[in-house]
Amino acid sequence: MKTKFIAISLGVALLLVRNVSSVADASWLSKAMDRLETSNAKLSPTWPKAEQYRHYRPGQAIGAPLPDEDMRIAGVSLGTSFDAVKASLGQPTSEKRDELTYGGIKFGHSLMQDSRPIVWYMTVSNRDAVTARGIAVGDSLKKVMDIYGRPDFIDFNNRWFYGYLRYNSDNIVGIFFEHNGSKVTKIIISDN
């Protein structure tokens, strides 16, 4: 009886170990393929580089306004009052005078605007939300480019921007994708 129990226990343990390693192998392979795909894309002459975006005159218009649905996160649009955000999403995990936080999503307000706080910018720092076109933190830059096309601008912090801006000014309306060189690390939707 004791031998049978030991044999069954060893069999179960071997199955568990075997399944864990195959999951790790699949994850490793997926990550390696993603790195290879991004590396190949970066070698392409069509891959955007920051220096390609430095020839503009101050005040020059760049890009075009994005559709309204692109300027929304978790059903909230720029210009929405903080009260309407709370009515839609419930009680925030953190609330400050100029910011509402729901996990990895922040809705911000400029204190220089009127006294009734409205959403002026939104940031996503984890996979709690996606853009209207389905991009989330952790997605590859290749996926961003496949869905949004070439960036309208790459700023001095190497963030990819899609939307409308006036070069060297605060007139910026669109989406920034912060990244680590291959993956999106933060999404910012802004109306400065």
Question: Residue locations for each model-derived region?
Answer:
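Sec-dependent N-terminal signal peptides of Gram-positive bacterial secreted proteins and lipoproteins
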Residues: M1-A26
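Glycine-rich loop/hinge motif
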Residues: R133
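A cross-family detector of function-defining hotspots
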Residues: W47-L66, D70-R72, S77-I118, S125-R127, ...
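N-terminal propeptides/low-complexity segments immediately following signal peptides
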Residues: A26-P48
